[in-house]
Amino acid sequence: MRYFIQLAYNGTAYHGWQYQPNASSVQETLNKALSVLLNTTINIMGAGRTDTGVHASQMYAHFDSEKKLETTSLVHKLNSYLPKDIAIFDIFPVSNEAHSRFDATKRTYEYHINTLKNPFLEGLSWYYHQDLDVALMNEAAKLLLNHTDFQCFSKVNTDVNTFDCTIFDAVWRKENNRLIFTISANRFLRNMVRSIVGTLVNVGLHKITLDDFENIIKSKNREKAGFSVPAHGLYLTEINYEYLK
């Protein structure tokens, strides 16, 4: 039987979601916990691959079990067994053909910036105190929706078949002393959101114009785009599936 698992994690202590041979990952931590509790080897497949230090307030993964599971009890056992920076919200059966990664229709990320130094946001938001033209940054963000090839924002030498992504929404909002960028797409490239945010910050600083921003996208050249903002401000916040509406 196949099961979906819904979880969240603080990514500070992990070298991303995906298994790393010489470093701690969220996937490996979950595999070990499930394998111990179910007394069999479990290999979970995540809906995405967050990078080192990136957080997730919603992540889905799937795994297979030869026997029917008592899911409510398993959720409690996992939360007791796992470290405090990983929380399990739900485990539920799905069809054997369901796939947490390939069936996802939309993914949403948020990037958090705090403009006032706050020790309680350390490691959870990027502290950046320079004044930013948020209205202009939102104009630039809208331009993303006019394009599909985002090679300029992708990590160099990444192993992908295509740089095409369909962006559904991209917007900045102010909340007290915080700026939050929300972006939704059918898929994302490695380092894509962080390099988009860094380039939009350059727009907000008036270092580049709206035309410059659009020309960067058209260039397909990572060197022309802005810096990658720190990972600790990035959150995977929502994953959508047609059959989980």
What does each model-identified segment do?
Residues M1-K245:
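Structured-RNA-binding interfaces characteristic of tRNA pseudouridine synthases
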